[in-house]
Amino acid sequence: MPWSVLEALRNNPELLIESMKKRCKDPQPVYEAIRVDEEWRKTLQEVERLRHEHNKITREVAKAKDKAEREALIKKAKELLALKEELEKKLKELEAKREEILLSLPNLVHPSVPEGCDEDHNVPVRFWGKPKVWKGHLEEFEKQTKRWGFEVEHEVVEEKPVGHADMLEKVLRLGNTYKAAQVASSRFYYLFKDLVWLDYALMMYAMDFLSKKGFVLVEPPYMVRYKVLRGVIDVETFKDAIYKIEGEDLYLIATSEHPLAAYKMEEIIDESELPIKLAGVSPCFRKEAGAGNRDLKGIFRVHQFHKVEQFVFSKPEDSWEVLEELIRNAEELVKGLELPYRVVNVCGGELGSPAAKKYDLEVWYPAQGKYRELVSASNCTDWQSYRLKIRYRIKGGKKHDFVHTLNSTALATTRTITAILENHQLPDGRVRIPRALRKYLEPFESAPKDYIEPWTGI
């Protein structure tokens, strides 16, 4: 199959137009692509006509016996050749223009993606766990559950839980964002003692889980070239969110998804190798330029963090089943951490350009009284593979097709720590460590085992 966006342009342009509208974007680029493609096809037909005519006259030259007739035919052949070459040049220019427009378009939206332009239109598909709901947040809790037709069992608490930022710096005193801001800038942090152990235990937990599921653990490069970035994201939209190395064609990765996608760049994979399941383990670096003053306190939204990422190269016919597998994996991990959550089907207006469909897994934050994103799982179909030139060889033939690429968070450690601090805090200031993490701490004598304890600080 050809690239899905080009195929839609040729055979069902209305699909592209509706997809843009569903994303709450102006479909004008699609109309422009249609115009350019129609002109390209007309020009191609004219080139073919001229080629046929030139070949015909060339054969007539060989047969001509009269000198004047031969010279007239040769002159005509040269004129046709010059005209054909001129149109071939125009053809290449139109093809480049069409490609430029099509590459600027986001992916085709899957039919199951909800309508809507902002996160209020994300549709919950399931809930898990018994959240602790402060009595002052009951109305807000019902808006996030009953509004969508879900009756979620919950525990009403009289005292408002302590927010994760205050737990971090005032109660436990195991983090310091004020000093980090002096040393670096806002949205950086120092973590100490038990929280450092917890950070690495979370990574080990996710790595162990995914390796047992058949994922290959990968520690990728922490920087990528511009051509890789251009192949995996909409660079123009996100250029202010990415750290560039001054004077070099290198960018710090915002997620291991990007170098993992590029691992098979410009390759043809044998069909028998698919699916290829990778678990990326890396630090991530994000400017968070568009975050403004949101989540300035604590370590919920930061410039650097550790993350374990799921990434899959899949056959097109299997990719939607793989997406469900990825979100189920994330759910298993979060269930193991005993964190109440919901899964939402993200609406069209909230989808990033590469994603045809995305699920967010949102954990309940008792102090905030809302579900917050912990995991995102996306099917990017052939949006990335077309740009990175990743194909697979179909069994029994020479035909090649673009693979589908999928990604999902397994665990992002700092954000997961904030969820643990809010959901597992105790009245005496300690925080209960989820049982699933304890085996990754037990081998180390100085590591916490059952509880994270308040500290006097340094």
Swiss-Prot record:
Q: Which domain of life is it from?
A: Archaea
Q: What is known of its domains?
A: Consists of two distinct domains, a catalytic core and a N-terminal extension that is involved in tRNA binding.
- GO BP terms, alphabetized: selenocysteine biosynthetic process; seryl-tRNA aminoacylation
Which pairs of Cys residues are joined through disulfide bonds in the record?
Answer: none
High-level lineage:
Archaea, Thermoproteota, Thermoprotei, Desulfurococcales, Desulfurococcaceae
> What GO molecular functions are on record for this protein?
ATP binding; serine-tRNA ligase activity
| InterPro entries referenced in this protein's UniProt entry, alphabetically | aa-tRNA-synt_IIb, aa-tRNA-synth_II, aa-tRNA-synth_II/BPL/LPL, Ser-tRNA-ligase_type_1, Ser-tRNA-synth_1_N, SerRS_1_N_sf, SerRS_core, tRNA-bd_arm
Q: What is this protein called?
A: Serine--tRNA ligase
Identify the species of origin: Ignicoccus hospitalis (strain KIN4/I / DSM 18386 / JCM 14125)
Q: Subunit structure, per the record?
A: Homodimer. The tRNA molecule binds across the dimer.
